[in-house]
C-alpha cells in the first residue's frame, strides 16, 4: 500500500493533533511550537494559495527568516506539488548586494513565485 505525504500529514493531524510537531527556540530562548493539527491546517492554506498561483512542478522561492513560519510554507509547497527553494530574506544593511544575491538564486532556480511572511 502506498501512502502519500498528504495522507501521512493528515493522519498525524487526526491522531496526534494536539502533540507538538515542531518547536523553535529564538535567541532569547523563548520557545514557539506548532502542533500537528496547526501544521496541517496552515500547510493546507499555503497549498491552496500555491495551487491558485502556480502549477505542480514549478519552483517556489520560500523566503523566510529562521523560525516556525517556514515549516507550514515548506509542507504546503509539498502538498501543492511545487518544488521549494529556500532562501533567507535579504538583509537591507548589506545594500544592493543582498538583493542581487537573492535575484541570482531566483534566476538560477527558475522560480515562478516568491512566498514570504507578511
Named regions from a protein language model:
Residues 1-23, 41:
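A short N-terminal helical cap/helix-turn-helix that marks the beginning
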Residues 81:
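Structured binding elements
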Residues 22-72, 91-103:
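Conserved AMP-binding/adenylate-forming core of the ANL superfamily
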Residues 85-117:
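Conserved ATP-dependent adenylate/AMP-binding module captured primarily in the ANL superfamily
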Residues 76-77, 105:
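Hydrophobic/aromatic ligand-binding patch that stacks against planar heteroaromatic rings
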